Swiss-Prot record:
Domain of life: Eukaryota
Name of the top EC class for this enzyme: lyase
EC numbers, comma separated: 4.2.1.-
GO MF, one example: 4 iron, 4 sulfur cluster binding
Transit peptide: 1-28
Protein name, UniProt field: Putative aconitate hydratase, mitochondrial
Similarity section: Belongs to the aconitase/IPM isomerase family.
Amino acids binding substrate: 108, 201-203, 489, 494, 685-686
InterPro entries assigned: Acnase/IPM_dHydase_lsu_aba_1/3, Acoase/IPM_deHydtase_lsu_aba, Aconitase/3IPM_dehydase_swvl, Aconitase/IPM_isomerase, Aconitase_4Fe-4S_BS, Aconitase_4Fe-4S_dom, Aconitase_dom2, Aconitase_mito-like
């Protein structure tokens, strides 16, 4: 009877998708000879030839890491990038400004809006490189895919219509709502060994599980690639992570990165590429490697990647890319000197070794992804910190952990519990990563197994992971509560808008097991659960399949993109009265002098993530409308003077919200700066966290340190990121102080060469001078002088 019910639900879902197909696939063009190539095959011949040129520039005896090989073989001009300011190529890492030409760009629906609005202003007929848009961030997770998907499509129709029409006009592959999460779709369709791509999402490095250099960027950076302008990256240092042994028992690939995050912290990877190597690599599946690379974003790494592995071949073949598998295997057969492996004598700036054979499961959180605790010590840690000993929901899936392997390992545990007569004591939610994964799990009865346990299958989208979760368990806002997820990020308020929801990150199999106890102190390795019959039940370690034995099921064809064909006859409409979309007005250029009379809008205490600066969740609806979304600027920031959140005070002591005070000052023509602590802008590639302050009159962000992506995004939008030369000076500057820059204008005019100071006038009239540092390159200086990178591109 149960299978019949599940079958009826699946049939109803297929009927629903068929009904939605016209609005999902409306009028997409078909391929013609004039179409720019949308081949999933990387340009291997060109890349290999470029690597040969790099070896000529640096000398054939120079040993290169895998990351260096792929990056340098994508340089626009190898000699210029590698030999300028690098002691004739001897000091490239951390010093060279690499001018790169990526192979591909991927964008998700929330960030694609602003990226496209910027691209459209450049006036080109099509994108210069293959590009794709994936509608995943704006789908709500609440009661299940059958209800949530059509409601989300209807509620976001204007935005989806805009994205689809722009895709048709400019020749971009459009993956409609419900097709899947960007990173899972990229892994299944576009990622390949040796590829270099950009994505407008911080978890783009997920593609590194298949041997690609994939870097998360803001929309302005993506536009560089889309218009065929070289994209600039400070040459990263390389962190080598050597994997030895093989995972045992309950340990999963997720535990490798959870453990590593605890070692490195949220900023320990800043300025580094994490390059995995060693004999343990070949014990991991492709999707397991992708999970590890995905969460490299949580330690601030530029990207993460794995070398070519024999396990890449069956995955590529299973995802209809046998030609890519054959080509990559042929290149890799040349050994360590090939494009797809590090040279034997390559040196790493830092090296960490992890023994997989002794690694135990880890749980990270709450409120930060680097608070890592081994499972064996977690119960003790819960009690020590007075965290809740029960939890409300377990959520598995997402871009980090929705592979066939992940789901079948979780399914194995559900089957064990079903046989023992157990039901989950916490709500269980399942998010398939793509239509291909969902359809395959449906065919193989995995989804019916989850449903038999009362699990709710959400749409193939981000949902709760990005804050699109409408909880139905009536937890009051501000109330301490716990959830367990297999997601990648757990900042306060991220999932449900409640800053007191404690999200503990773990593998999907561990999350699944814990839901049956409903207890944060349960250890499935050692603890048992009493069954309805009174017997004691203990889980066996989970097992699963890397790939489906029957192959992947494609699923509903309505979710497949058509071949990209630019069509200039397609009109891309943006209504002047829209509350969701607004064309961009150019930012004003930098004045012909240093900045004067900047007021300190706010002094931030502690962690300030991109979620803090530009919240997601219900605000995602305004991603294409800069004036409207600017109303959430810094609403999660804590006032250093008072400890209040989103409470700012003007010179008269009057209280305001931060965006309200910023808007008032903008209306008065007053420009301002923000003062912050470490790793400002930690988290996502969300360029709105740079656009919004700029729109409201922000000129400078002064911090102890910055997250890499956010620092770049600020420069692209004409905001100057400065750091304290002496971090103790953070205590010398306060809200409403007045600041003038000294030496900044000359530094910008000199292409980033020069020293900068800030002259600060206190409320008392006292003046102090604070020396500051910057990382401005020549190109970045030109962006700021012009007002933004887009202003520079538009003139070209």
């Amino acid at each position: 009877m149960l299978r019949q019910i599940v079958s009826q639900r699946s049939a109803a879902r297929r009927q629903l998708i068929d009904q939605l197909a016209p609005c999902l696939r409306r009028g997409l063009a078909t391929a013609t000879d004039s179409t720019p190539t949308s081949s999933r095959m990387p340009p291997y011949s060109k890349i290999v030839q470029n690597l040969e040129q790099v070896r000529k520039v640096l000398g054939s005896s120079r040993a290169l890491t895998l990351a260096e090989k792929i990056l340098y073989s994508h340089l626009d001009n190898a000699e210029e990038s590698l030999l300028t300011g690098t002691n004739n190529g001897r000091d490239i890492r951390g010093k060279a400004d690499l001018k790169l030409k990526p192979d591909r760009v991927a964008m998700q629906d929330a960030s694609a809006q602003m990226a496209l609005l910027q691209f459209m202003s450049c006036g080109l007929p099509s994108t210069a490189v293959p590009a794709s848009i994936h509608c995943d961030h704006m789908i709500v997770g609440e009661r299940g895919a059958d209800t949530d998907l059509p409601a989300s499509i209807q509620g976001n129709k204007e935005v989806f219509d805009f994205l689809e029409s722009a895709s048709k006009r400019y020749g971009i592959e459009f993956w409609p709502p419900g097709a899947g999460i960007i990173h899972q779709s990229v892994l299944e369709n576009y990622s390949a060994p040796g590829l270099m791509m950009l994505g407008t999402d911080s978890h783009t490095p997920n593609a590194g599980g298949l041997g690609a250099i994939a870097i998360g960027v803001g929309g302005a950076d993506a536009v560089d690639a889309l218009v065929d302008a070289p994209w600039e990256l400070k040459a990263p240092r390389i962190l080598g992570v050597r994997l030895e042994g093989k995972l045992q028992g309950w340990a999963a690939p997720k535990d490798i990165i959870l453990h590593l995050a605890g070692k490195l912290t949220v900023r320990g990877g800043t300025g580094f590429v994490i390059e995995y190597h060693g004999p343990g690599v070949e014990t991991l599946s492709t999707t397991g490697m992708a999970t590890i690379c995905n969460m490299g974003a949580e330690v601030g790494a530029t990207t993460s990647l794995f070398p070519f592995s024999p396990n890449h071949v069956p995955y590529l073949k299973a995802t209809n890319r046998a030609d890519v598998a054959e080509a990559a295997a042929k290149i890799a057969s040349a050994g360590s000197s090939s494009l797809l492996r590090a040279d034997t004598s390559a040196e790493y700036d830092e090296l960490i070794t992890i023994d997989l054979s002794t690694l135990e499961p880890h749980i990270n959180g709450p409120f930060t992804p680097d608070l890592s605790v081994p499972l064996s010590r977690f119960a003790e840690t819960v009690r020590k910190n007075n965290w809740p000993e029960t939890f409300n929901a377990g959520l598995i899936g997402s871009c980090t952990n929705s592979s066939y392997e992940d789901m079948t390992r979780a399914e194995h545990l559900v089957k064990q519990a079903n046989a023992a007569g157990l039901k989950p004591k916490a709500d269980l939610f399942i998010t398939p990563g793509s239509e291909q994964i969902r359809a395959t799990l449906d065919r193989d009865q995995t989804l019916s197994t989850f449903s038999s346990a009362g699990g709710t299958v959400l749409a193939n989208a981000c949902g709760p992971c990005i804050g699109q979760w409408k909880r139905t368990d009536d937890v009051p806002k501000g109330t301490d509560n716990a959830i367990f997820t297999s997601y990648n990020r757990n900042f306060p308020g991220r999932n449900d808008g409640n800053r007191r929801t404690m999200n503990f990150l773990a593998s999907p199999e561990l999350v699944t097991a814990l839901t049956y106890a409903g207890s944060t102190t349960f250890n499935p390795v050692t603890d048992s659960i009493t069954t309805p019959s009174g017997s004691e039940f203990r889980f066996e370690p989970p097992t699963g399949q890397d790939l489906p034995s029957k192959g992947f099921e494609a699923g509903n064809p309505a979710f497949q993109p058509s071949a990209p064909v630019p069509d200039s006859s397609v009109e891309v409409k943006v209504s002047p009265t829209s509350t969701r979309l607004a064309l961009l007005e150019p930012f004003a250029p930098f004045p012909n002098s240093d900045l004067q009379n900047l007021s300190v809008l706010y002094k931030v205490k502690g962690q300030c993530t991109t979620d803090t600066i530009s919240a997601a969740g219900p605000w995602l609806k305004y991603k294409g409308h800069l004036p409207n979304i600017s109303a959430n600027t810094l609403i999660g920031a804590v006032n250093a003077a008072t400890g209040e959140t989103n409470v700012a005070y003007d010179e008269a002591g009057k209280q305001h919200t931060i965006p309200d005070l910023a808007a008032q000052w903008k209306a008065q023509g007053r420009e301002w700066l923000v003062v912050a602590e470490e790793n400002y802008g930690e988290g996502s590639a969300r360029e709105h966290a740079a656009l919004q302050p700029r729109y409201l009159g922000g000129r400078v962000i002064l911090a102890k340190s910055f997250a890499r992506i956010h620092e770049t995004n600020l420069k692209k939008q004409g905001v100057v990121p400065l750091t304290f030369a002496d971090k103790a000076d953070y205590d010398r500057i306060d809200a409403c102080d007045v600041v003038a820059t000294e030496g900044l204008y000359e530094t910008l005019k000199n292409g980033g060469k020069g020293e900068v100071k800030l002259r600060v006038t206190k409320k008392s009239g006292e003046e102090i001078v604070i020396p500051v540092k910057h990382t401005l390159s020549a190109d970045q200086s030109s962006f700021i002088l012009a007002g933004s990178a887009l202003n520079v591109l538009s003139k070209r």
